[in-house]
């Protein structure tokens, strides 16, 4: 298992998943990646690939909209908001915009961001009030980001990876990766409201003892 999961590896896996339209290939690629991770990073990665910043049962949100993303990208790269808008219109995706301008703004890239740091940023954004403060937090991490790290960090904050991977396919990948029944994975995820914990339990073959959690809607 990988001791420290990098956002770059997550992003490269996401790119491979996006490059195929075949569901079996998508789940195989994701399953191979998930098997390499430690339990904490497995939980993070499963949530993120399902498009969740937090567990489904967790009511927290980052409240990071387009204005914060635009301002942070501008501050991190030196491009003005006026430069960014026509690029966004052309590309149609804030993550693709991030990748393009980071690549142009930096002469060299050294991917260093981890999934732990990604989770920390998401938590801090949720806890922080005010557009300026949120922008500063995001800018600081974007300044360290490679084009691919920036692309998927922004996609995650925007709420959609857009790689053709819905939650049911993530459940399927978990089931295949850890040799569990898909029905058991899906049922546990429904009861737990956390696909990350579901993935960890699937690895441990501990899906049958899951109980519904009170006050967490199914």
What residue spans do the PLM features occupy?
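N-terminal nucleic-acid-engaging modules of covalent nucleotidyltransferase systems
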Residues: 1-218
């Amino acid at each position: 298992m990988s001791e420290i999961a990098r956002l770059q590896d997550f992003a490269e896996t996401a790119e491979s998943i996006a490059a195929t339209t075949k569901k079996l290939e998508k789940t195989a690629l994701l399953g191979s990646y998930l098997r390499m991770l430690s339990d904490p990073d497995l939980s993070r990665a499963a949530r993120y690939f399902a498009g969740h910043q937090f567990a489904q049962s967790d009511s927290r949100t980052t409240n990071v909209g387009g204005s914060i993303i635009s301002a942070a990208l501008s501050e991190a790269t030196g491009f003005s908001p006026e430069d960014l808008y026509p690029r966004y219109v052309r590309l149609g995706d804030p993550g693709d915009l991030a990748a393009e301008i980071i690549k142009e703004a930096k002469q060299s890239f050294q991917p260093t961001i981890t999934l732990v740091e990604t989770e920390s940023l998401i938590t801090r954004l949720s806890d922080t009030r005010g557009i300026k403060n949120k922008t500063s937090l995001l800018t600081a991490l974007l300044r360290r980001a490679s084009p691919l790290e920036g692309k998927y960090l922004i996609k995650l904050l925007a709420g959609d990876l857009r790689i053709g991977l819905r939650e049911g396919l993530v459940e399927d990948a978990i089931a295949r990766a850890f040799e569990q029944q898909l029905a058991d994975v899906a049922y546990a995820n429904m009861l737990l409201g956390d696909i990350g914990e579901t993935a960890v339990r699937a690895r441990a073959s501990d899906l049958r003892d899951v109980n519904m959690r009170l006050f967490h809607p199914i």
